[in-house]
From Swiss-Prot:
Residues 95-117, 135-143 are extracellular. Inward rectifier potassium channels are characterized by a greater tendency to allow potassium to flow into the cell rather than out of it. Their voltage dependence is regulated by the concentration of extracellular potassium; as external potassium is raised, the voltage range of the channel opening shifts to more positive voltages. The inward rectification is mainly due to the blockage of outward current by internal magnesium. KCNJ16 may be involved in the regulation of fluid and pH balance. GO terms for molecular function: inward rectifier potassium channel activity. It forms heteromeric channels with Kir4.1/KCNJ10; this interaction is required for KCNJ16 localization to the basolateral membrane in kidney cells. As a heteromer with KCNJ10, may interact with MAGI1; this interaction may facilitate KCNJ10/KCNJ16 potassium channel expression at the basolateral membrane in kidney cells. May form heteromers with Kir2.1/KCNJ2. Can form heteromeric channels with Kir4.2/KCNJ15. It is found in: Membrane; Basolateral cell membrane. Expressed in the brain, testis, liver, spleen, kidney, submaxillary gland and adrenals. In the kidney, expressed in the epithelial cells of both proximal and distal convoluted tubules, in the endothelial cells surrounding glomerular capillaries and in the flattened parietal layer of Bowman's capsule. Residues 118-134 dip into the membrane without crossing it. This is Inward rectifier potassium channel 16. It is a multi-pass membrane protein. The chain crosses the membrane at residues 68-94, 144-171. Keywords: Cell membrane, Ion channel, Ion transport, Membrane, Phosphoprotein, Potassium, Potassium transport, Transmembrane, Transmembrane helix, Transport, Voltage-gated channel. GO terms for cellular component: basolateral plasma membrane; monoatomic ion channel complex; plasma membrane.
């Protein structure tokens, strides 16, 4: 069966992930819409012409400095020290100029000893704020203004030091670095799990000190345009089987594609054609600091592999459990019908009706019940497995297969498995 067509192309993923052949990722030729959330969790959003932008940043200057980059933070802190030294140095120089200390008259008691130039005043300001205290320059009791200036500079130096140390510690203890050690699988998978189509991705924590507890959440973001050409974004929560996890070992997050899922009516071809993005978040508490962290990632249709399951990463040893991190991204191709979960449920319903109404079932009923899901997934949807066919409705696309033909198909599969 060929999956090549005029409107699809094979996406090459061999360069970065050699374990995935190119034919496993199918995407549309049209230009893909830019994603809202990058793979590293950063938002692809740019705000322009914000009302009161600088005012809002200056009001919450502490948070602004914590969120800024380290090089910008270093420039701000350096300028705060240098400007404070220059300002108070200028004040001491003006005091000395007004009092006549620059004339070096021995009959005049200076306000600040040994300050006869602006350079000397700047050095005295630096020594005062950093509490160096060389002893060569000192303030006298001749001028109360000079004494008051020294007091103000000492208070301001304590404020600046406290502000800088607090911001630096808060920036080093930020949750962003811890969030970088939480890893999401690059691809999400769609495959059969316990007889149902499921969307799966993997989360792993590769630090020795693991998280205490965590909550996983997933949302499907769908882009659409109205009649006037305006783009709208609609968010739909995905119900997860295991949303509360303890991330001691890598965990596979599972979303069952049922009637409440927004992926319920999408088959393999429709997933490749659709324009959506799955946003996944993991909120957790670290056992080292006890603070809350959040890790984010997203999956677009070209990053969803149909008919795959993840490799096992956990090995049970005699005295411990071994996690093979090399298999974290690995997956193996397994059978999965190309039709949607809605079509699978419709075929199951048709099979149940056949079981109730057909009198010729006889003794084969119990044997068929045990393999009902295999019957539905293999025999009944055999006409749906071509992704190039147009998907209109379950009745139009998946035509009913006669019971005798389906039973013959099951018998042939059973005989081939026993050989």
């Amino acid at each position: 069966m060929s999956y090549y067509g005029s409107s699809y192309r094979i996406v090459n993923v061999d360069s970065k992930y050699p374990g995935y052949p190119p034919e496993h990722a199918i995407a549309e030729k049209r230009r893909a819409r830019r994603r809202l959330l990058h793979k590293d969790g950063s938002c692809n959003v740019y705000f322009k012409h914000i009302f009161g932008e600088w005012g809002s940043y200056m009001v919450d200057i502490f948070t602004t400095l914590v969120d800024t980059k380290w090089r910008h933070m270093f420039v701000v802190f350096s300028l705060s020290y240098i400007l404070s030294w220059l300002i108070f140095g200028s004040i001491f120089w003006l005091i000395a100029l007004h009092h006549g200390d620059l004339l070096s008259d021995p009959d005049i008691t200076p306000c600040v000893d040994n300050v006869h130039s602006f350079t000397a005043a700047f050095l005295f300001s630096l020594e005062t704020q950093t509490t160096i205290g060389y002893g060569y320059r000192c303030v006298t009791e001749e001028c109360s203004v000079a004494v008051l200036t020294v007091i103000l500079q000492s208070i301001l130096s304590c404020i600046i030091n406290t502000f800088i140390i607090g911001a630096a510690l808060a920036k080093m203890a930020t949750a962003r670095k811890r969030a970088q050690t939480i890893r999401f699988s690059y691809f999400a998978l769609i495959g059969m799990r316990d007889g149902k189509l499921c969307l799966m991705w993997r989360i792993g924590d590769f630090r020795p000190n693991h998280v205490v507890e965590g909550t996983v959440r997933a949302q499907l973001l769908r882009y659409s345009e109205d009649s006037e050409g305006r783009m709208t974004m609609a968010f739909k929560d995905l119900k997860l089987v295991n949303d509360q996890i303890i991330l001691v070992t890598p965990v596979t997050i599972v979303h069952e594609i049922d009637h409440e899922s927004p992926l319920y009516a999408l088959d393999r071809k429709a997933v490749a054609k659709d324009n959506f993005e799955i946003l996944v978040t993991f909120i957790y508490t670290g056992d080292s600091t006890g603070t809350s962290h959040q890790s984010r990632s997203s999956y677009v249709p070209r990053e969803i592999l149909w008919g795959h399951r993840f490799h096992d990463v956990l090995e049970v040893k005699r005295k411990y459990y071994k996690v093979n991190c090399l298999q974290f991204e690995g997956s193996v191709e397994v059978y999965a019908p190309f039709c949607s979960a809605k079509q699978l449920d419709w075929k199951d319903q048709q099979l149940n009706n056949l079981e109730k109404t057909s009198p010729a079932r006889g003794s084969c009923t119990s044997d068929t019940n045990t393999r009902r899901r295999s019957f539905s997934a293999v025999a009944m949807v055999s006409s749906c497995e071509n992704p190039e066919e147009t998907s209109l409705s379950p009745q139009d696309e998946c035509k009913e297969v006669p019971y005798q033909k389906a039973l013959l198909t099951l018998n042939r599969i059973s005989m081939e498995s026993q050989m």
